[in-house]
Curated annotation (Swiss-Prot):
Free-text function comment from the UniProt entry: Component of the ubiquinol-cytochrome c reductase complex (complex III or cytochrome b-c1 complex), which is a respiratory chain that generates an electrochemical potential coupled to ATP synthesis.
Domain Rieske span(s) in chain numbering: 88-181
Short name of any one Pfam family annotated for the protein: UCR_Fe-S_N
InterPro entries on file: Rieske_2Fe-2S, Rieske_2Fe-2S_sf, Rieske_Fe-S_prot, Rieske_Fe-S_prot_C, TAT_signal, TAT_signal_bac_arc, Ubiq_cytC_Rdtase_Fe-S_su_TAT, Ubiquinol_cyt_c_Rdtase_Fe-S-su
Protein name, per record: Ubiquinol-cytochrome c reductase iron-sulfur subunit
Record's signal peptide: none
Membrane topology: Single-pass membrane protein
Required cofactor(s): [2Fe-2S] cluster
Gene: petA
NCBIfam families, per database record: Rieske_proteo (TIGR01416), TAT_signal_seq (TIGR01409)
Subunit structure: The main subunits of complex b-c1 are: cytochrome b, cytochrome c1 and the Rieske protein.
Length: 183
């Protein structure tokens, strides 16, 4: 009797049952590994509450000239002030060379009448006063830090006291005439 030869594929070039099982098992194994690894990869994404804090949209249409509001961005207070023409003129008249942290008013604002900055004193992290009508505004008609006596002008620049830097300006953009996107 002649011995039959066993080949890996049939004469028409079709895959054999063995090849089908190998490919099928490999595919199922790859899907299983992907499903097992997915929770670990997904864990590295930021949480939904963190993403929600990434940016804040502020409607500034209700803020009267000379008034200010405080919003929260990334867990910090952000001061948004609708400055008067007098505040703008006084802030722009200051020689930057006379400041501890030299910065022009124009470099701190995108639109002259709107000042947006993080309301945390750069000395030890207190929240300066000056947002409300009855708050002390310091010697330069801006903000006053009650913790150690730092005085900021109407552009948020340090003018007197122990704070080393100006109040920081967060990244922001006007999406239209009355809406500011912070962050």
């Amino acid at each position: 009797m002649a011995e039959a030869e066993h080949t890996a594929s049939t004469p028409g070039g079709e895959s054999s049952r063995r090849d089908f099982l190998i490919y099928g098992t490999t595919a199922v194994g790859a899907v299983g590994v992907a499903l097992a690894v997915w929770p670990f990869i997904d864990f590295m994404n930021p949480a939904a509450d963190t993403l929600a804090l990434a940016s804040t949209e502020v409607d500034v249409s209700a803020i009267a000239e000379g008034q200010a509001i405080t919003v929260t961005w990334r867990g910090k207070p952000v001061f948004v002030r609708h400055r008067t023409q007098k505040e703008i003129v006084v802030a722009r008249a200051v020689d930057p060379a006379s400041l501890r942290d030299p910065q022009t008013d124009e470099a701190r604002v995108q639109q002259a009448q709107w000042l947006v900055m993080v309301g945390v004193c750069t000395h030890l992290g207190c929240i300066p006063l000056g947002q409300k009508a009855g708050d002390p505004k310091g010697d330069f008609d801006g903000w006053f830090c009650p913790c150690h006596g730092s005085h900021y002008d109407s552009a948020g620049r340090i003018r007197k006291g122990p704070a080393p830097l100006n109040l920081p300006v967060p990244p922001y953009a006007f999406t239209d005439d009355t809406t500011v996107l912070i962050g």
